[in-house]
């Protein structure tokens, strides 16, 4: 398809139709929906301009596109880190309604974990955050992530391990999806 677009530029539209929603979702989760529209368009514009450099021996263009998107996100990294830091400083909402105690506790715990997670994401080195978010949000495999970032698969594995360790430590060393039981005071 990319090779064909060298002679028939309109053939590139198939690549856009196939992958634009996934690229948009990934960028939206990294930078917000407003920036996602622009960066998704910029990703495909850059891909179109660079299509002569694409390795046509590769069956799937997804890693290449996510690599371009990640590089564009890199230009916005400082704003992304500021956004995560700002989220971590938001005050907890006050719920004046009467709800079930367990629901209120669960919501408060989730809110606090969200703030700690945002702060931890902001504190991650960009190279670790990129690997983590390509795997978690873009749902790329280790191999696809390696191709997207032009690094060996072993580097992806080590960066992911370090990112997960840092997040685990920032979240108190436990899985944030598991509710903590109150100790029995018998």
Model-derived regions: residue spans:
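N-terminal module of bacterial RNA polymerase sigma factors
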Residues: 1-22, 184-186
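Structural recognition of an alpha-helix C-terminal capping motif at a helix-to-coil junction
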Residues: 38-45, 59-71
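C-terminal edge and immediately downstream basic/flexible tail or linker adjoining helix-turn-helix-like DNA-binding
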Residues: 85, 119, 147-148, 164-186
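Arg/Lys-rich amphipathic alpha helix in sigma70-family domain 2
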Residues: 49-56, 67-89, 110, 162
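Helix-turn-helix DNA-binding module
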Residues: 119-130, 138-155, 169
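Short, charged helix-capping/linker segments at alpha-helix termini
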Residues: 6-14, 24-42, 56
């Amino acid at each position: 398809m990319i090779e064909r677009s060298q002679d028939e530029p309109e053939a590139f539209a198939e690549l856009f139709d196939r992958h634009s929603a996934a690229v948009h979702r990934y960028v939206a989760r990294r930078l917000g929906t407003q920036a996602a529209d622009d960066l998704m368009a910029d990703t495909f514009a850059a891909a179109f301009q660079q299509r002569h450099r694409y390795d046509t021996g590769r069956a799937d263009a997804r890693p290449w596109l996510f690599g371009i998107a990640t590089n564009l996100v890199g230009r916005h990294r400082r704003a992304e880190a500021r956004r995560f830091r700002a989220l971590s400083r938001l005050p907890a909402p006050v719920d004046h309604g009467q709800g079930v105690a367990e629901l209120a506790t669960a919501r408060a715990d989730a809110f606090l974990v969200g703030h700690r997670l945002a702060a931890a994401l902001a504190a991650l080195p960009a190279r670790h955050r990129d690997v983590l978010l390509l795997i978690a949000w873009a749902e790329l495999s280790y191999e696809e992530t390696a191709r997207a970032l032009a690094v060996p698969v072993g580097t992806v594995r080590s960066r992911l391990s370090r990112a997960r360790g840092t997040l685990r430590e920032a979240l108190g060393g436990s899985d944030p999806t598991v509710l903590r039981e109150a100790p029995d005071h018998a």
